[in-house]
Curated annotation (Swiss-Prot):
Domain SSB: 1-100
Protein name as it appears in the record: Single-stranded DNA-binding protein
Keyword DNA-binding: yes
Keyword Endoplasmic reticulum: no
Any GO CC annotation of this UniProt entry: nucleoid
Stretches with biased composition (Acidic residues): 141-150
Coiled-coil ranges per UniProt: none
Biased composition (Low complexity): 129-139
A GO term, aspect molecular function: single-stranded DNA binding
């Protein structure tokens, strides 16, 4: 399965173009995604969004704004003008959610884009499990520390 979920900030405003022939909107942008254990380090992930999703991102998201995207990783290659083979890796955005509104971190309206299937609940805890889902009377067999292989 090829599925990716990222939360990051745009490094610059999205670049919106339209494909020749079909006229399909194509938005390209880069997300700066903080690393989990080293908050002072980030990875810069190239993203591409097509159609209405791309148009919406280009219209409402600007440099520095926080965005959640879900999609898949796509690799490719092309021949550069100097004749060398260049390789690319992009996240193709399938859906997205605005994380902040650009005014102090308030949550943005996620209803702008079609293709946005996070439904405004991205990052919110899933309350479908309760403490009662786990029976405290389960038969728990004690394990001796010497039986643990590490």
């Amino acid at each position: 399965m090829n599925k990716v979920v990222l939360i990051g900030r745009l490094t610059k405003d999205p670049e919106l173009r339209f494909a020749a022939g079909s006229g399909t909107a194509v938005a390209r942008f880069t997300l700066a995604v903080n690393r989990q254990f080293k908050k002072d380090e980030a990875d810069f992930i190239s993203c591409i969004a097509f159609g209405k999703t791309g148009e919406t991102i280009a219209q409402y998201i600007t440099k520095g704004r926080q965005l959640a995207v879900s999609g898949n990783i796509r690799t490719g290659s092309y021949e550069a003008q100097d004749g060398t083979r260049r390789y690319t890796t992009d996240v193709v955005v399938e859906s997205f959610d605005f994380i902040d509104s650009g005014n102090g971190g308030a949550r943005g309206n996620s209803g702008f884009g079609s293709g946005n299937d996070f439904g405004g609940s991205f990052g919110m805890p899933d309350n479908s499990f309760s403490d009662s889902s786990f029976n405290s009377n389960d038969d728990m067999t004690p394990i001796d520390d010497g039986d643990i292989p590490f």
